[in-house]
């Protein structure tokens, strides 16, 4: 496994949070934060990585910190999020609501009624 930060490079830390907010593509986040990545991992997990990075960033308090410290923390959160999905699948982490709600390892709840497709076909005389 290739670490995403094995080939990290120096970055421009000026007003880093505002610059990150203006980005849209996952590749842009890695470029701005100076982190290399495996395109195969990013192609499969890009949305999951960015969502997890956002969750990690939300836990941080950047108030009054210098740009260099903020940039280092932002870089660390992206590296951490990337590693989460470089070592396991998006289904393992389930960062999105739709995946959390449909976890096959969780028992079905009683508030959802399951109707087998076969019973619907029988009702219409089709089998």
UniProtKB/Swiss-Prot annotation:
InterPro entries: NifW
Domain of life the protein comes from: Bacteria
Pfam families reported in the protein's UniProt record: NifW (PF03206)
Functional note: May protect the nitrogenase Fe-Mo protein from oxidative damage.
Quaternary context: Homotrimer; associates with NifD.
Family as reported in the entry's similarity comment: Belongs to the NifW family.
Name listed for the protein in its UniProt record: Nitrogenase-stabilizing/protective protein NifW
Gene that encodes it: nifW
Keywords: Nitrogen fixation
GO biological process terms, semicolon-separated: nitrogen fixation
